[in-house]
Each structure stands twice: as C-alpha cells, then as structure tokens.
Amino acid sequence: MLVSGRRRLLTALLQAQKWPFQPSRDMRLVQFRAPHLVGPHLGLETGNGGGVINLNAFDPTLPKTMTQFLEQGEATLSVARRALAAQLPVLPWSEVTFLAPVTWPDKVVCVGMNYVDHCKEQNVPVPKEPIIFSKFASSIVGPYDEVVLPPQSQEVDWEVELAVVIGKKGKHIKATDAMAHVAGFTVAHDVSARDWLTRRNGKQWLLGKTFDTFCPLGPALVTKDSVADPHNLKICCRVNGEVVQSSNTNQMVFKTEDLIAWVSQFVTFYPGDVILTGTPPGVGVFRKPPVFLKKGDEVQCEIEELGVIINKVV
C-alpha cells in the first residue's frame, strides 16, 4: 500500500511539472490500477493534464490487458477513439497507479549498437546488420517503479530507448509492410549490468540485461498515427537532473521497418511484443572515469511526443 501511494504521489507531482518535450495529445493507451477498482484496467491518458479515462468503464466488454486489446485490432481501437472523442469524466492523477503499457509480452527484442553517434562514442564501426538480443518479460516494470540494484552487479548503467509495440501477428514481414504490424511506441529504460555484459556469463548479454526491474516502460503506448515521425524524435536521459544522454532517433542505424523485417525472418511477432531499438551516446560505462548508478539516484528517460518515465534506484 505504501509503494502504491508513493507511485500515485509521484504521478501527480510529475504531471504538474513542465518537461522539455511536450507529449502527443492524441491516442495514449495505458494500463493502470486505482484503489476503487479490482485489478488492472485499460485507459486513455489525457494530454491536457486532466487524468485517465477508464476504457473498461466506457465499454465493459473491452479486455483489461493491453495484449488482449491489441489482439482484437481495429475493433477495440475504434472503441478507444470513441471514448477519446466523448469527453468522458477522468480519474485524477492522484488516484492512478500507472503500470507498464504492456506486461508479459511473448517476447522483448533488443537491439545493440543501433545509433550512429553511440558507435562513434565507442570508436567502433556501424553494424552491417542488426545486433539482436533479448530481455525476459519478468524484467518489465511500470514507468514510475523503482529499479532495484542487484547484489550480483557493481556496474549498473542507464540506457534510454525508443520502444516499438507490435499490434499484428506476422512472420517474414517485408520492410514495406512492417508499419502495418506496429501498434505504437513508448519509452523504455534498458537498465544494464555492464560487468555481466563484458566479463561474466561468457560475455553473453542476456543475464546482464534481464535482472528484475531492468525494463521500465511507459508511461503510455502512443499509437503510431499519433506520432508524426518516430525516426525524428528528441531523446534524452537525466540522472539526478543532469542530462547524460541527448540525441535524436534520426541517428538510428536500422529503422523500425528494417528491424521488424530482419527479426521476423527468425521469429513470429505477436501483438504486445516489444522491440527496444537501441540507445544513443552518453551511457555511464564510456565516461572517463566510468559512472554507474547507485542507491538513491533518480533516472528520467524522455522521448519527444511519447513522454517521460522516472525510476528511483534502490
């Protein structure tokens, strides 16, 4: 109860602040809890600071999880559009606890070395094909949840990333058809244990990327039609208020369409699947000397039009 209360207070406080990048005011789908509701619900985050529209109250036949919502495609999206246009009563921020917009997806696909300026930071060549790895779904937490430092690592680092959420099943998808399989976009924090990436576990990346709480997502799934150009968005990360990463998604080596086409050669995409598209320069490990997260730090990951997620390190 204390944790939920702290999350609701943080939600209310951050909504009162002015952030550098203004979020889209269109379709912003969220998963949330509220004290008077049983279990998670689907909602629409309003862009004017008003709160959250409860989609399940608007139409009780709607599913209560984002994955099930996306599986039904246009039928459920049309209900959400009607709710947005209806100017319904909203739940105030102070009563809402935001969950990750997608929880327990079939897969979380991650991409390494996918920003030109991040490659320059490391003095390495730009990859000729996408570098793919994964996180377990159990690493996903909400946009304002805490990141827990694991005792197994002394080198936990930050990474702000644009996340793509799949809305339509597919395999062997052509790049020209890829955006038809995208539901929308959200902000991700790809928390990374550098010692486990570079010196442990045979230098395989999985364990260092997938500790519990190592994948905060949110605050909303912004539908693709609400984002003018996902490959021209300002992206930044702040640690304790200091800007540590600042770039633009136009620096991505492989764009959303290329990543979907590449990965779908190997696996089937399902609604709710998440693709973390890589991070820009400014991570702690490449600073001189290296800097890593410590207890008490606060990390803010923000992307233009999508919003900001804030995670305290404990």
Curated annotation (Swiss-Prot):
> Is this entry keyworded Mitochondrion?
yes
Question: Which reactions appear under catalytic activity for this entry?
Answer: oxaloacetate = enol-oxaloacetate
**Regions that span the bilayer:** none
Q: How is the cofactor bound?
A: Requires a divalent metal cation for activity.
* Entries under InterPro entries matching the protein: FAH, Fumarylacetoacetase-like_C, Fumarylacetoacetase_C_sf
Instruction: Identify the Gene3D superfamilies for this entry.
Output: Fumarylacetoacetase-like, C-terminal domain
Tell me where it resides. Mitochondrion
Q: Name one GO molecular function term.
A: metal ion binding
Q: In which domain of life is the source organism classified?
A: Eukaryota
Determine if RNA-binding is one of this entry's keywords.
no
Ordered alphabetically, the record's keywords are:
Isomerase, Magnesium, Metal-binding, Mitochondrion, Transit peptide
Main localization is mitochondrion
EC number(s) on file? 5.3.2.2
**One Gene Ontology biological process:** oxaloacetate metabolic process
The transit peptide extends across 1-84
GO CC annotation, single: mitochondrion
Residues recorded as binding Mg(2+), renumbered to this chain, are E159, E161, D190
Its cofactor is: Mg(2+); Mn(2+)
Instruction: Say what the protein does.
Output: Tautomerase that converts enol-oxaloacetate, a strong inhibitor of succinate dehydrogenase, to the physiological keto form of oxaloacetate. It is thereby required to maximize aerobic respiration efficiency by preventing succinate dehydrogenase inhibition.
Hey, which family's this protein in? Answer: Belongs to the FAH family.
Record's protein name: Oxaloacetate tautomerase FAHD2B, mitochondrial
Query: Native species of this protein?
Result: Homo sapiens (Human)
Name of the gene encoding the protein in the UniProt record = FAHD2B
